[in-house]
Amino acid sequence: MKKKILVVDDEDFQRDLLNKLLTKAGYTVSDAESPEVAFTLMKKEDFPVIITDLIMLDMDGVEFCQRIRERNSHSVIIALTGYADLYDLEKLKQVGFDNYLTKPIKLDKIQPVVEAGFKKIKNRKKSHR
């Protein structure tokens, strides 16, 4: 399975940093500056893992996650936040997130969460056979 990731963040710096770190780690990365751009990309391609910022201008990450779940329940969705104290994993799971990452972004923090996401996808596919 090709390890494709979609990164959604309205901050250019964060998006570029994630793209560089994940590409360097061997993943195939696409990115979008808004949920609307992300939905356009998702119509053309399947992304097993989606990493999205929680606070964005046009649509927040929670609404974005809920809309993804309405369309596609198999992707692993990882929240990205600089405000870890405002969110807890259980609340995020209730709205459809699989996991979360906190800023500042570092590869040694991201890679285990992303790999767990790909493992979860593999298990979901096995259970649907």
Segments the model singles out, each with a brief description of its role:
Residues 56:
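Receiver (REC) domain active-site loop signature in two-component systems and cognate sites
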Residues 16-24:
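Charged docking surfaces used in two-component/phosphorelay signaling
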Residues 45-51:
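Active-site beta3 strand of CheY-like receiver
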Residues 63, 84-99, 112:
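Alpha4 helix (beta4-alpha4-beta5 surface) of REC/receiver domains from two-component response regulators
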Residues 40, 62-73:
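Short amphipathic alpha-helix used as the core "switch/output" element in two-component signaling
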Residues 105-114:
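C-terminal output helix
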Residues 31-40, 61:
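Helix N-cap/capping motif at the beta->alpha junctions
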